[in-house]
Structures are given as C-alpha cells and as structure tokens.
Curated annotation (Swiss-Prot):
It comes from Oryza sativa subsp. indica (Rice). Keywords: Developmental protein, DNA-binding, Nucleus, Transcription, Transcription regulation. Residues 41-168 form the ALOG domain. Residues 12-22 have a biased composition (Gly residues). This is Protein G1-like4.
Length: 202
C-alpha cells in the first residue's frame, strides 16, 4: 500500500514543484487569453485528494467502486488518515488535556486536525460531483460525515484548549464619518460673538 496522503499540507506547496510559480502566473491576467492556465492551489489539492481517495477505494478489501461508496466508507477513510496526522490531541488522562501550549512533550497521539478534515471533505464533496456523481447520493455530504466532523471539532477543542468559533468582525465606527466637529480641524470655524446690546454703548 503506497499511499502518502497529506491533506493537512495545502499551504506548504512542498509536494508539487511548481507550487510557487503558479501564484505568479495568476498575477498577470492580460497574458493568458490563449495560454493554458495552471490550476489554482485549491484545484491542484482537490485533484490530489480525489486521486488519494480513489487509490484508497482500489486498495480496500474488497475493492470498492465509487457507486458502492457510502458515508460509512468516507468515515473509514477519514479515520485511516489519522495515522498521517501532525496535530497532538491530548487524551483525558494527560496532564496537558485542555492546555493550548503544553510545557513539555507527552505520549498523546497525533491526529488529523479538524480544520484539515473539514477542508478535505469539502474538496472531495465537490470532486465527487465534478466526476459524475449525483448530489443526492454524495457520500461526502452524508449526515454521518457531518456529525463526525462536528464530534472531532468539539473533542479537539476540549483536548487542545482551543476555540474553533468564528471571530466576530468589528463594525466600522460611525464616529469617524459623523463626529468631525469635535476635532481641532474645525476650531477656526466658530461664529463671532454677538455684538453688545445698543444701550451698552458709551
């Protein structure tokens, strides 16, 4: 079995020799009307993931066709990928359980990070339909797969002491648009004081 899947290394670009050059070719859109454009990093990673999954199905005992593949097989594939993970996930018995920055090494297992699995499933869900699969029978969109990903996220958040909640974006402050009157720039525009009353004149 000669599989070397690496779903949590899309940013590195180490696996494809031309990863660094593809981003520079996208920076000059005026050149490429007739020239073949190299696939984006996402498309290249999606193709690699799809090939890895296809190889997994072929090496399965018994071998599976894509039509036979179910959500249960996807879960089996995701668990299989854990052996290639690089993320330390502390067990409940570990003294560093829940610590985001443990001060010393521990024997806890390495797993695939939740974010890597979530992105992988998204790419494979798209690739399944691009390769002729019907959306209603997409095993990567199965409820069991969604529940598994949610379970992994919650477990890793507790074990690693990190939060996977999305950060709320701050709204732009309205004072910069409205509150210019209090700034020193408008200090010279004060109205002159009213003239003294007529009876006050000598």
């Amino acid at each position: 079995m000669d599989l070397s899947p690496n779903p949590d290394s899309p940013p590195s670009g180490g696996g494809n020799g031309g990863g660094g050059g593809s981003s520079s070719s996208n920076s000059s859109p005026s050149m490429g009307a007739g020239a073949p454009q190299s696939p984006s990093r996402y498309e290249a990673q999606k193709r690699r993931d799809w090939n890895t999954f296809g190889q997994y199905l072929r090496n399965h005992r018994p071998p599976l066709s894509l039509a036979q593949c179910s959500g249960a097989h996807v879960l089996e594939f995701l668990r299989y990928l854990d052996q290639f993970g690089k993320t330390k996930v502390h067990t409940a018995a570990c003294p560093f359980f829940g610590h985001p920055s443990p001060p010393a090494p521990c024997p806890c297992p390495l797993r695939q990070a939740w974010g890597s699995l979530d992105a992988l499933v998204g790419r494979l869900r798209a690739a399944f339909e691009e390769n002729g699969g019907r959306p209603e029978s997409n095993p990567f969109a199965a409820r069991a797969v969604r529940l598994y990903l949610r379970e992994v996220r919650e477990h890793q958040a507790r074990a690693r002491g990190v939060s996977y909640e999305k950060k709320k974006r701050k709204k732009p402050q309205q004072q910069q648009l409205q509150g210019g009157d209090s700034s020193g720039l408008h200090g010279h525009q004060h109205h002159p004081p009213p003239p003294p009353p007529a009876g006050a004149a000598c």
